[in-house]
Amino acid sequence: KRFCSRIATGDYDAVIIGHSQFEKIPLSRERQIALLEDQIADITYSIEAAKEETGQQYTVKQMEKTKKTLKAKLEKLNDQTRKDDVVTFEQLGVDRLFVDESHYYKNLFLYTKMRNVAGISQTDAQKSSDMFMKCRYMDEITGGKGITFATGTPVSNSMTELYTIMRYL
């Protein structure tokens, strides 16, 4: 808490922070709710589109499962009591985000109508979801120019891994 308060009140050109500490800095509850509602709306639209196509029953079931998971996250967020003494990511005044070792965030869920495609993750890592939400916020305040990802690890598994990294940016 003290470290985040110093970042928020200080006049720093750069702050270097480890991944584990970065993940502990939450987005505001309101922003998390709005982003989850956007994701639920997107998947609802995709479900309706898949229902209109014939032979997409498996895909619809998978997307319904994802929608249920997102709704559970939203309900959990709504049930949480808010701590007033927590400095949120928005309050830090960050205007540029450089992420080293960005390959650690490759497990971001991707819902799609395609089936049996190698590398499409059916699970979602919390740290990846957190980074995705923070990147969406950075896109809002910088016009899509506030994020830089760096890694020395080559794309190894599939094109979906590259697509996932590009979704952040």
Please state what every model-predicted region is.
Residues 103, 142-158:
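Conserved helicase ATPase motor motifs in RecA-like P-loop NTPase domains
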Residues 1-137, 158:
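SF2 helicase/translocase NTPase motor core
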